[in-house]
Amino acid sequence: MFLSHQYDSFWIFLLVCISIPLLAFSITRFAAPPREGPEKSTSYESGIEPKGDTWIRFQIRYYMFALVFTVFDVETVFLYPWATSFEELGLFAFVEVIVFIFILIVGLVYAWRKGALEWC
């Protein structure tokens, strides 16, 4: 028998999580005065008047570095809990981490050979 009251706390939590950002955006939208004008669409340059067009296109190499950084940053997030509980997890977890690191190294070598890490 399916008891729906078991999930009441989940639904309340979900409702609160959805309503808090909506409430915050609604309050600022209605409470703040409207600010229309040409200054609204310009970029802020630490008080200095912007020179030229401020909307520039970034080269793809910046995105590749950001992508590689993100991958290895997430790897660190996965490896830290494993490292803190290394002795309790045993040999199977050690082999899994070795496979995980090996896959990341293969990806890094592939990106390196494709020139994704070349700056010039």
Curated annotation (Swiss-Prot):
Topological type in the membrane: Multi-pass membrane protein
Record-level Gene Ontology MF annotations: NADH dehydrogenase (ubiquinone) activity; quinone binding
One of the GO biological process terms: photosynthesis, light reaction
Record EC number: 7.1.1.-
InterPro entries according to UniProt: NAD(P)H_OxRDtase_bac/plastid, NADH_UbQ/plastoQ_OxRdtase_su3, NDAH_ubi_oxred_su3_sf
GO cellular component, one term: chloroplast thylakoid membrane
Name recorded for this polypeptide: NAD(P)H-quinone oxidoreductase subunit 3, chloroplastic
Biological source species: Adiantum capillus-veneris (Maidenhair fern)
Gene: ndhC
